[in-house]
């Protein structure tokens, strides 16, 4: 049965929002300040669950815990449902006496603040000018419990947002005629409580000392509370009406929208496959060679699915900025043909921050100061003016309204139909967009994962963690004069790491490593890391403005990541110790297979499409990206004729380590020279490493220099301007041949689009196999045990992917002509040949003294 929403229905749309989300959005105010948590930060939420249960369990009498409440309001063109769970509801038989409110024992650390019957209040502004209670029947009270990391005895009034949450629950009780309470009474019991007034209690609990409690009680009449609640709802309704009107325009714009170009060979099948995947809530692996138009082939059906009600949002995810530009262009093409879809390209904080460097607090940044006072107006204004939001648009609006552009961009994304961003915004537990992917949150999201081959290493990086012994010692030195308990905790952790270091020093080998499997040892490490992290949390809360915070910040995040990763580890992880580049002991939690972690994030959406020009072998990627058995794969045929290219394999070249030397480098240099001499144009030669590249380049310059051939080499540290200057050497119809010396897997090996005569040849040196190292060997061992295919998983598949990406820089359009030269005899082995794309079936093996003749024949036929 289809879950398609009825887009032609005249029924008003139902919009649901939690009480907490409503008040936090409408009533937020103040500064951005990364030096402090907001009283209810992530840590407090985790610990708060325990405190909630303890407080609720201790209540006696008629106290009801976790009471679900909801109210639907017809707002004309939509229905708004506000819902949530009240922490507690109870009756108060004697509203003027504080003891009557409490059904459990009050500890000596409990503080109670109440508005008395005469209307006096030690906390101005909570209950001003309310009439005295004239109905002596028991009154219902809503209890809102908040666990915070501070001495709650210092609080003089509740936070506005917290109190507003409780008031919303109280208002819903009025609106529902107290049904949640009355229906919970025994069948033969008549409700006996005041129906015109209601009490609200804010219960604050110190999470570090949960016997410290501070309670604030206030009283509201029906009329005043419902008027307040309606004002909150009306303010939110403005946003809802704007969004609904936009969706109507968006969906109407899709009526006449068709695929913007004539379908290329195989492209229509891609579009249909993506559409069926979304309808079926499935996952698709799509390999489409350059020229098929894969980006539009996934974006167009996704847009149609949103317009037809199958999905709410599109997340277009990439690993590199260049690919984001390609995705944005696809949405712009559809917009040029009438599509009205709000689309945002998210930029990292570092790249969009208008300050010299991000320092997100009101003392250092004017955009952080009062940000939350202005940001809602800034966002609403921008949504009314534009449909496409990139870095320049966001930054201009943020400066005009004096708000943080990064945070404003995230708020704008909440009201968009398509979000284009880095992988980590969706998949990284440390950086994902919590408004969409936070714990327990799900939606009808479509994940379009571009250049999906890059997700393998990125995912392993996201879900791995590590801690360095020297960092622990450095942190101990910083805190020893501030907190003895923190210093002791760090010293205990250091001792555990020292024991591992001593054991590692006994391991022979050039790059020794030690795999830890003893559960007792691992348990001690986890406990000491948790204890040290807990002490640092306390230290950070108690010294919010201390200068040492800056020194500790990196280590704080390091150990936080380590602790959270440790807690979620399973048998897809390997724990090992080695020495890092600085010869310091590093203890690593290495995620060898990220499939389960990725699946948990993908399951928060509707469906996912993983697409790339290089997803071979597809089963390799399936096992690394998903745990589902039923996934689908589509391999699109290239639209280009075989006559447009020639693939040559140099059978007399070996790039194995033992074969490297001057004679082999000379042979490779000659291959490059003869390839470039066969026809004037632009070429790129890709090498497995910088050292290999420079060794060959040295011989090329000395022995094969030609007056009519220029060359340029990639350097290790190139900024964006350096890259642009490098690519400017590859222009149309050059008068002289240009050879670019590049590195496989680098910035010029993928994501660049040099069409026509801007690039007519790619020489790929070696199979791209990763260097033998600790992690590659751990991967080989793991996958040998799991699949019996350890070498291929650790070395061949990642290496050949780099080869395919590098070679894919040639032949970008149906007008292009070019050559691909693969230099390594291993390309002719069965394992490598199985990974050749279909378009390479007519490859030509040859030796260095034959390559010129092969190329001459090819170019003569063009």
Regions found by a protein language model. Name each.
Residues 244-287:
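Conserved pre-motif I regulatory segment
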Residues 247-251, 255-258, 310-419, 424-427, ...:
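A substrate-engagement module of RecA-like helicase motors
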Residues 74-116, 125, 130-226:
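Mg2+/Mn2+-dependent nuclease catalytic core
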Residues 1-92:
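Metal-dependent nuclease catalytic cores that hydrolyze phosphodiester bonds in DNA/RNA
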Residues 279-301:
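Walker A/P-loop
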Residues 298, 325, 401-418, 422-530, ...:
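Signature of the SF2 helicase/ATPase Hel1-core->accessory helical subdomain module
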């Amino acid at each position: 049965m289809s879950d398609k929403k009825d887009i032609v229905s005249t029924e008003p749309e139902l919009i649901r929002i939690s009480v907490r989300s409503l008040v936090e959005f409408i009533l937020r105010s103040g500064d951005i300040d990364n030096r402090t948590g907001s009283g209810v930060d992530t840590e407090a939420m985790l610990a708060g669950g325990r405190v909630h249960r303890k407080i609720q369990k201790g209540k006696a009498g008629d106290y009801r815990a976790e009471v679900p409440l909801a109210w639907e309001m017809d707002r004309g063109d939509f229905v708004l449902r506000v819902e949530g769970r009240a922490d507690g509801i109870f009756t108060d038989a004697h509203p003027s006496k504080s003891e009557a409110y409490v059904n459990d024992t009050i500890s000596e650390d409990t503080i109670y603040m109440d508005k008395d019957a005469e209307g006096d209040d030690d906390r101005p502004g909570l209950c001003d000018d309310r009439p005295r209670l004239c109905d002596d029947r028991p009154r219902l009270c809503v209890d809102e419990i908040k666990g915070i990391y501070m001495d709650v005895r210092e609080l003089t009034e509740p936070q506005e947002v917290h109190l507003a949450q409780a008031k919303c629950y109280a208002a819903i009780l009025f609106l529902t005629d107290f049904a949640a309470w009355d229906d919970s009474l025994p069948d033969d019991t008549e409700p006996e409580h005041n129906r015109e007034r209601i009490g609200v209690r804010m219960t604050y609990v110190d999470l570090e000392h949960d016997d410290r409690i501070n309670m604030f009680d206030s009283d509201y009449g029906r009329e005043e509370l419902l008027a307040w609640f309606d004002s909150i709802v009306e303010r939110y309704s403005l946003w809802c009406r704007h969004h609904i009107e936009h969706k109507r325009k968006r969906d109407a714009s899709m009526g006449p929208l068709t695929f913007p170009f004539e379908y290329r060979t195989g492209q229509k099948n891609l579009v249909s496959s993506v559409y069926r995947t979304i309808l079926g809530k499935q996952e698709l692996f799509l390999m489409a060679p350059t020229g098929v138009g894969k980006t539009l082939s996934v974006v167009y059906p996704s847009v149609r699915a949103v317009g037809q009600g199958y999905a709410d949002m599109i997340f277009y995810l990439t690993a590199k900025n260049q690919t984001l530009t390609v995705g944005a262009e696809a949405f712009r093409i559809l917009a040029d043909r009438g599509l009205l879809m709000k689309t945002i390209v998210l930029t990292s904080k570092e790249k969009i921050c208008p300050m010299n460097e991000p320092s997100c607090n009101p003392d250092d940044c004017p955009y952080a100061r009062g940000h939350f006072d202005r940001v809602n107006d800034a966002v609403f204004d921008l949504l009314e003016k534009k449909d496409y939001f990139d870095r320049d648009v966001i930054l201009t609006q943020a400066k005009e309204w004096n708000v943080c552009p990064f945070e404003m961009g995230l708020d704008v994304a909440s009201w968009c139909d398509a979000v284009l961003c880095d992988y980590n915004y969706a998949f990284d537990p440390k950086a994902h967009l919590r408004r969409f992917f936070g714990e327990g949150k799900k939606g009808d999201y479509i994940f379009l994962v571009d250049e999906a081959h890059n997700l393998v290493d990125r995912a392993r990086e996201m879900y791995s963690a590590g801690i360095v012994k020297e960092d622990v010692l450095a942190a101990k030195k910083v805190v020893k004069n501030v907190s003895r308990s923190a210093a002791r905790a760090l010293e205990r952790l250091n001792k555990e790491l020292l024991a591992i270091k001593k054991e590692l020093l006994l391991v022979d080998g050039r790059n020794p490593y030690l795999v830890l499997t003893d559960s007792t040892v691992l348990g001690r490490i986890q406990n000491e890391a948790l204890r040290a992290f807990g002490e640092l949390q306390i230290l950070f809360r108690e010294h919010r403005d201390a200068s040492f915070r800056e020194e500790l910040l990196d280590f704080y995040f390091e150990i936080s990541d380590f602790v959270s990763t440790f807690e979620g580890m399973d048998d897809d992880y390997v724990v090992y110790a080695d020495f890092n580049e600085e010869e310091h002991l590093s203890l690593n939690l290495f995620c060898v297979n990220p499939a389960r972690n990725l699946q948990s994030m993908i399951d928060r959406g509707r469906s996912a499409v993983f697409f790339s020009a290089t997803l071979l072998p597809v089963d390799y990627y399936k096992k690394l990206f998903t745990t589902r058995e039923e996934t689908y794969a589509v391999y699109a045929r290239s639209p280009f004729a075989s006559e447009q290219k020639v693939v040559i394999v140099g059978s007399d070249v070996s790039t194995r380590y033992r074969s490297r030397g001057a004679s082999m480098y000379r042979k490779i240099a000659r291959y490059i020279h003869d390839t470039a001499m066969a026809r004037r144009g632009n070429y790129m030669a890709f090498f497995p490493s910088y050292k290999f590249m420079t060794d060959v380049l040295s011989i090329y310059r000395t022995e094969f220099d030609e007056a009519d051939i220029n060359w340029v080499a990639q350097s290790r540290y190139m900024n964006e301007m350096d890259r642009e200057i490098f690519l400017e050497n590859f222009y149309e119809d050059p008068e002289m041949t240009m050879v670019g010396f590049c590195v496989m897997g680098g910035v010029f090996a993928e994501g660049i689009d040099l069409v026509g005569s801007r690039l007519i040849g790619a020489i790929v040196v070696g199979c791209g196999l990763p260097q033998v190292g600790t992690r590659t060997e751990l991967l080989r061992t793991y996958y040998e045990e799991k699949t019996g295919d350890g070498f291929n998983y650790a070395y061949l598949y990642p290496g050949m992917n780099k080869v395919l990406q590098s070679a894919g820089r040639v032949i970008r359009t149906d007008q292009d002509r070019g050559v691909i030269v693969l230099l390594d005899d291993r390309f002719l082995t069965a394992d490598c040949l199985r990974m050749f794309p279909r378009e390479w079936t007519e490859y030509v093996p040859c030796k260095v003294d034959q390559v010129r003749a092969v190329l001459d024949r090819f170019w003569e036929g063009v």
